[in-house]
Regions:
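N-terminal cap/lid subdomain of alpha/beta-hydrolase-fold enzymes
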Residues: 57-119, 307
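Conserved acidic catalytic loop of the alpha/beta-hydrolase fold
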Residues: 131-151
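Conserved hydrolase catalytic core segment
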Residues: 150-188
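Alpha/beta-hydrolase-fold enzymes
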Residues: 173-257
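Active-site nucleophile elbow and catalytic-triad environment of alpha/beta-hydrolase enzymes
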Residues: 266-282
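Short beta-strand/loop motif that positions the catalytic acidic residue
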Residues: 286, 292-294
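Conserved alpha/beta-hydrolase "acid-adjacent" motif
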Residues: 299-306
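Catalytic active-site module of serine/aspartate enzymes centered on a nucleophile-bearing elbow/loop
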Residues: 318-357
Length: 357
């Protein structure tokens, strides 16, 4: 329970808290089931090999068409069970109706109840990257759950980046791909600069003590909130919510008043894992029908750079759906609300050819 609260605290610190006014239907899908699987002799990109515990959540029955759902940085499967996401997708008649689909939501390596530094190894835990995390997903699904083929891989933010990797690394394993709040290009520019500044702030806190801290570094709260405000929330939404200095201060005060119960080593590993992300070399290998979903006001993946548009030309069966910016969108957080794109997702599933199952 400790770790699920930690992940939830990170998520709350990075979103607009009470300011996020997404409306969604109540969850009326089957009760999620929890499980664990041990990946023996898991090899990390640095060469280290060890057993890795992979926690996962499933909704629906194994007889349904398998769908892999991937969460964002610092989160867990719980982040995909919100009314705004799961409540819009997993219920009767919805795009991923659990009566038809077998929904698999892993806790990524380093996250939730899967193996991570805070389990005891601290900084001796192998450094992992997004390729490692996707390989762990693949082993869980193929070996642990015995799934031979996926109908869909869908992911948000970090999960969106994982989805891009999935498509190029295991191109015949799925029928459809929906990477969200992400772009299929090298982690760089302001997105990485701000990530690095957040991590450097935590590392250079004397409390951190090279990962051998007794209490969590005090500066972690400020680093996380600075990054969250700078890279998520939406320009128009913030202007509406904080049109005065007093209102802006209230938002900051409310965020800083929230406890950050995440473990610093876990947090650093989670975000540093994105440093060498670059699915670009494999884009030509993607075979599945792909629907990329981004928000026009996404601070981390700004569409005006043109890099996603250029990359999409290399995806044989790909298209991009850009959610227009408004006071209802929340920048990078927009895709957490499936109401913005459930129609497009439904159309994808109706038209994507069903290959081997």
């Amino acid at each position: 329970m400790k770790f699920s609260r930690a992940a939830l605290s990170i998520a709350l610190a990075l979103v607009s808290l009470a300011l996020v006014s997404f409306t969604a239907s109540a969850a009326d899908y089957p009760t999620p089931k929890q499980g664990d699987w041990i990946a023996k002799d898991f090899k990390f990109h640095g060469g280290e090999t060890m057993e890795v515990r992979l926690h996962y959540t499933t909704i629906g029955e194994p007889t349904g068409q398998p769908v892999l759902v991937l969460h964002g940085s610092g989160g867990s499967a719980a982040n995909m069970l919100t009314p705004a996401f799961g409540g819009e997708l997993f219920g009767p008649g919805q795009p991923l109706d659990a009566a038809k689909y077998y929904i698999i939501i892993p806790d990524a390596v380093g996250h939730g109840k899967s193996s991570k530094p805070s389990d005891g190894m601290k900084t001796a835990f192998p450094k992992y990257n997004y390729e490692d995390m996707v390989d762990a997903h693949y082993r869980l699904v193929s070996e642990g759950l015995g799934v031979k083929h996926l109908r869909l891989v869908i992911g948000n933010s970090m999960g969106g980046m994982h989805t891009w990797i999935w498509g190029g690394k295991y191109p015949q394993y799925m029928d459809a791909l929906v990477p969200m709040a992400s772009q299929p290009t090298e982690m760089a520019a302001r997105n990485w600069m701000l990530r690095r500044m957040m991590l450097e702030t935590i590392r250079n806190d004397p409390d951190y003590n090279r990962g051998n801290y007794i209490t969590q570094p005090r500066m972690m709260k400020y680093a996380i909130n600075a990054y969250g405000i700078a890279t998520a929330g939406g320009t128009l939404a913030y202007q509406m919510q904080a049109p005065t200095g007093v209102a802006a201060d209230k938002i900051v005060d409310d965020r800083l008043a929230l406890p950050i119960t995440a473990d610093a080593n876990d947090f650093i590993y989670q975000w540093e894992a994105s440093h060498d992300y670059n699915p670009s070399p494999r884009l030509d290998k993607i075979e599945a029908k792909l629907l990329a979903i981004n928000a026009a006001d996404d601070e981390r993946n700004p569409p005006e750079t043109g890099v996603t548009d250029a990359a999409m030309k290399r995806v044989k069966n790909g298209q991009l759906f850009l959610i227009p910016a408004s006071t209802e969108t929340r920048g990078h957080l927009t895709t957490g609300n499936a109401a913005f794109y459930k129609k497009q997702l439904q159309e994808l599933l109706q038209t994507a050819p069903q290959r081997t199952m």
